Structures are given as structure tokens and as C-alpha cells.
């Protein structure tokens, strides 16, 4: 089971933890002294019921184990929003293409950062290129 824990210094950065809380209570976990595994981190901002993901990183030893999908599922189940917007890095195109198909999203041929190839919207929403550009600009001005 995935859990997001706010990083201590940044309000937009969250550690991705793999827990086994669904099997044991927190009291039992503390007694057994089981550690939560840190499997990566995610940076995102919420604005007007839209989540803007600026970076999702899963450590290499935990890749290809569907943790990325679990993070997206966690966002859908724990936050109230209309859609997720983000950009696709060249090395993560495969993952985001699968997410777009799985969650009925769409790809847009606009990007803010130089090392990205396009942007995506999950699930499919009517958002103009100007709105996407403004949201990406907003997130980059706050995060970077």
C-alpha cells in the first residue's frame, strides 16, 4: 500500500512510502519495528481542482513493479480534483502513455520545459493550450 508523506522543507514535495498498514495496525507495526520503505518522491501542486505534477521519481530498484500506477491511484482516492496535468520526460514516455490509456487521458503537443516532449491530461478534460501553458508556468514559478 502506498502512502505519501510531506517532505519537511517543501510544501509541494512528498516522499512515496510503501507500507504494510493494511495487514497490521499502527500499534503492531511500532511494536514490530517495521520500517516503511521509501520508494521515490513526487512533486505536485494543486490549483483550482487541478493537480499539476512537476516530477514523479521512482528509485531504480523499485521500477517495473507498478508503483507509479499505485501513486496515481492514491492521488485519485485521497484528493478531490478534476484532472491531473503534467509533462512527459523523454525517458518516461512509456509509463505516461500507459497511464493515459489506463485512466482515459489525452496527450497535448505543448510543453514548458526543454527536456520534455509533450504534456498530458488525466482524465480527459476540455482544457485549452493557453490554460495548460498557464498552469505549467504557475507550477514552475512556485517549485523552481
Where are these regions (language model features)?
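Conserved GNAT acetyl-CoA-binding A-motif
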Residues: 77-91
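Conserved beta-hairpin
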Residues: 9-40
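Conserved acetyl-CoA binding element of GNAT-fold acetyltransferases
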Residues: 49-60
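C-terminal "cap" of GNAT-fold acetyltransferases
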Residues: 109-144
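Conserved N-terminal entry element of GNAT/NAT acetyltransferase domains
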Residues: 1-12, 138-144
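Conserved acetyl-CoA-binding loop-helix of GNAT-fold acetyltransferases
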Residues: 58, 64-77
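Conserved active-site tyrosine of GNAT-family acetyltransferases
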Residues: 96, 100-101
Amino acid at each position: 500500500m502506498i502512502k505519501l508523506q510531506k517532505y519537511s522543507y517543501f510544501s509541494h514535495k512528498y516522499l512515496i512510502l510503501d507500507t504494510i498498514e493494511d495487514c497490521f495496525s499502527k500499534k503492531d507495526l511500532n511494536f514490530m519495528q517495521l520500517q516503511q520503505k521509501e520508494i521515490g518522491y513526487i512533486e505536485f501542486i494543486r490549483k483550482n481542482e487541478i493537480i499539476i505534477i512537476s516530477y514523479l521519481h521512482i528509485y531504480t530498484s523499485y521500477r517495473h513493479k507498478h508503483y507509479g500506477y499505485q501513486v496515481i491511484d492514491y492521488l485519485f482516492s485521497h484528493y478531490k480534483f478534476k484532472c491531473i496535468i503534467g509533462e512527459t520526460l523523454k525517458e518516461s514516455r512509456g509509463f505516461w502513455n500507459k497511464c493515459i490509456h489506463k485512466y482515459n487521458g489525452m496527450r497535448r503537443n505543448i510543453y514548458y520545459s526543454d527536456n520534455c516532449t509533450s504534456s498530458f491530461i488525466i482524465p480527459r478534460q476540455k482544457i485549452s493550450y493557453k490554460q495548460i501553458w498557464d498552469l505549467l508556468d504557475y507550477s514552475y514559478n512556485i517549485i523552481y
